[in-house]
Structure formats: C-alpha cells, structure tokens
Amino acid sequence: MSKNPLDIIRDLDEELFKGVQLSRDLAFKEGALSVKEKYLIAMALDAAHGASDGVLSLAKQAQAAGASKKEIMEALRVAFYVTGAGSIYTAAKVLENI
C-alpha cells in the first residue's frame, strides 16, 4: 500500500494519531462481524461518501481478508440501493485496480 494518509497527523500530533489508531483497531477487530465484513461495510460507506481512494484501499483490504470481487460488488449494490448512483460512480473510478 502507499503512504498512510495520516502520517502527517502522526508527525504533528502523535497523541491524536494514537487515538485514531485505537479507534480503527476497535472498529476492525474480529467480533460478531468478521474483519472481511467490516471492510466491506466501510468500503460501501466510503462509496456513499464519494471517497474513491477509500473505496480502493478498503476493497483491497477486504480482498486481503478473504473477500471476492463478487462480495465487493454485492456490498456496492447495498450502497447503491441506500444512496443512489453516486456511490457506483465513485466505485467505478477505482475498481479496475483491485
């Protein structure tokens, strides 16, 4: 993966960075939902918010956690249903890279 976009936060405010990392660790730890499912949810949310870089990063992390391209697309179907076409256009910008 490329450089962590939060490196600048770590450099400027290490305490804040540690808090963000703790929050991320809590959100993505194995629990009632698998890590794969959590990455798929986060990816769909990024698609809904127009964050194409996040879609790409989270799709790759979901794949690393065992998600198939079909599972990625099904998660995007849910985002499309809830938020409309914008989420699909956001995802389309980056899906060729997974």
Residue positions per predicted region:
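Acidic, glycine/proline-rich low-complexity segments that act as flexible tails and inter-domain linkers
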Residues: 1-38, 60-64, 87-98
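Residues within well-ordered alpha-helical secondary structure of globular protein domains
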Residues: 22, 44, 78-81
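Alpha-helix C-capping/helix-to-loop hinge sites
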Residues: 27-30, 47-48, 79
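Short runs of predominantly hydrophobic/aromatic residues within well-ordered alpha helices
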Residues: 37-40, 72
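Amphipathic, charged-and-aliphatic alpha-helical interface segments
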Residues: 39-52
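Mid-chain, well-packed structural core segment of small domains
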Residues: 50-76
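C-terminal structural segments of small proteins and small subunits
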Residues: 69-96
